[in-house]
Design a protein with these regions (language model features):
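A generic structural signal for short
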Residues: 90, 143-144
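Short helix-coil transition/hinge motifs at the ends and kinks of transmembrane helices
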Residues: 133-143
Length: 195
């Protein structure tokens, strides 16, 4: 009965057993504090901060996707790319297929944690769902969507060709460009003279 109780405490990370020494109570730690919710996206700076997080994670995900992708992953990536192109043609904002493309990159890693993180974050990671178009796309919405599409095509091509370095570079460029567009939009918005 005592062994069973100790096993449960170990599984819960409440105690640690050191063979030949004994069992020790571990210090309590706060494991559930990390959250990114819509409440965390109240300013352009918040959106930029999440983009910086995405740059670090999704750059590596793209490299892993290039290394590990399957033919089925390629089909799913191509379908998401086509759905985004179709959305542009009908003057849609393209958020669902944009997110789907990034989700398919995550799936192509073969690492469920990338997919779980993308699922957790959801479409709120797409900057144009958090800020107005003038801020995220100072060059105009249609031109902006075409730029994104071109960047997605570069990511897809690198993953298809299993070029790990090119996939990382393409994803880093894509997300860094989004960050820079937001910074420029923010600066242009804050420097406008009052009427």
């Amino acid at each position: 009965m005592v062994r069973e109780a100790l096993s449960k405490l170990q599984a819960s990370s409440l105690v640690e057993t050191r063979h030949g020494i004994g069992t020790f109570v571990l210090a309590a730690h706060d494991a559930g504090n990390f959250k990114i919710t819509a409440k965390n996206f109240t300013t352009v700076d918040d959106v930029i901060a999440v983009l910086e997080l995405r740059i670090s994670l999704e750059t590596e995900a793209a490299g892993l996707a290039a290394e590990r992708r399957s033919p089925d992953n390629l089909k799913a990536l191509r379908a998401a790319l086509q759905a985004f192109e179709d959305a542009i043609k009908v003057d849609s904002d393209g958020v669902p297929p944009d997110f789907q493309f990034h989700m398919e990159v995550a799936r192509s890693t073969g690492n469920r944690h990338f997919t779980d993180l993308m699922t957790y974050l959801g479409t709120m990671i797409i900057p144009r769902t958090r800020v107005n178009t003038a801020m995220s796309a100072p060059e105009g919405r249609l031109r902006y969507l075409k730029l994104i599409n071109g960047e997605h095509r570069s990511i897809y091509k690198a993953i298809k060709n299993q070029d790990v370095d090119a996939a990382r570079a393409a994803m880093r460029t894509h997300l860094s460009n989004s960050r820079e567009r937001l910074r420029k939009g923010k600066n242009a918005h804050t420097q406008q003279p009052e009427s």
